[in-house]
A protein has these predicted regions:
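Short, conserved active-site entrance elements at the starts or edges of catalytic domains
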Residues: 2-5, 148-181
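ATP-binding pocket architecture of kinase catalytic cores
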Residues: 21, 26-115
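A cross-family kinase active-site recognition segment
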Residues: 91-158
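A structured, mid-to-C-terminal "fold-capping" secondary-structure block
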Residues: 232-260
Length: 283
């Protein structure tokens, strides 16, 4: 996330030379130019994929930010993307966010798997590699084996070490799942925008190739760990396929992010550990 204004040539390429920018701190470090938002992108391939997908995707009961192409047709220019501005802000309406995820994933069910989702994380890591590695850790037979083999730096902080211990314990509780993977948005907590009674909005799609109930599980794990959700949230979605096993992999994923991410804070761990205990009780 950056607060640096988009450079003049980027603004010009998106046709935004005449408009005064307004900083939108919480919109992924974006800048608003009238009806258009310029945001810095963390990963070019993912940003271009998200833009292309959002250009035509239609989802019942969801407003999607549409990409604004540069004058030469590009989605990403010098590390910036442009989208239509959506009114709204994240709110702790956790059940509604899970509902949004189910509607979104009906619409993404027929999308092909992008090539970049099959690529392993590469050293030296950037932000996106941390999430790829953490995602793999939750599903591979021996969590984090590939990372250790690749010489990745695993956390040495007390909470980081505790995260790694928990991942090892939780891994033994996994059973094979049958729900097929598809294209899902793996980071919906805190990214769905609400504006009163208006239709919820979404500005980006963070792609993973996993089962739909796993993506719902990540929302629930995040909401319980950091969003002040009531404990009943866990049970209200128990009808989703293979729910306990999906929650298990979702909490392993978040624990792995905690252990691997350089900006993890000790304060984030207690909520996550408590959620891991709750998930254990569902198995």
């Amino acid at each position: 996330v950056t607060s640096v204004e988009p450079p003049e040539h980027v603004r010009a390429t998106f046709g935004l030379r005449e408009v005064t920018p307004v900083s939108l701190g919480d919109w992924e470090g974006g800048w608003r130019f009238g009806d258009v938002v310029l945001s810095p992108v963390a990963d070019h391939a993912r940003a271009a994929w998200s833009a292309k997908t959002r250009e035509t995707l239609k989802v019942d009961g969801l407003r999607l930010a549409r990409p604004v192409r540069a004058t030469d047709g590009r989605y990403v220019v010098s590390g910036w993307r442009a989208d239509t501005y959506l009114e709204g802000a994240p709110e702790p309406r956790h059940d509604e966010v899970v509902s949004v995820s189910l509607r979104l994933h009906q619409a993404t069910a027929n999308l092909e798997r992008p090539r970049f989702l099959a690529q392993p994380p590469v050293m030296p890591w950037v932000d996106v590699d941390v999430f790829v590695a953490a995602d793999r850790a939750a599903w591979e037979p021996v969590p984090l084996r590939t990372l250790r083999a690749g010489g990745a730096a695993l956390s040495t902080s007390p909470d980081g070490r505790r995260s790694l211990e928990l991942i090892g314990q939780l891994a033994t509780l996994r059973k094979p799942v049958q729900t097929p993977p598809q294209l899902v948005h793996g980071d919906l907590f805190g990214t769905v925008l609400f504006a009163g009674a208006h239709t919820p909005g979404l500005t980006d799609i963070t792609p993973y190739w996993r089962p739909v109930p796993w993506a719902a599980g990540v929302i629930v794990v995040d909401a319980l760990s950091w969003g002040g959700a009531d404990d009943g949230l866990l049970d209200r979605w128990a009808d989703l396929p293979e729910w306990p096993q999906m929650l298990l992999r979702a909490v392993m994923f978040r624990l792995a992010v905690h252990a691997l991410h350089p900006r993890s804070t000790p304060q984030a761990f207690p909520g996550l550990a408590r959620t891991a205990d709750m998930v254990r009780l569902t198995l």
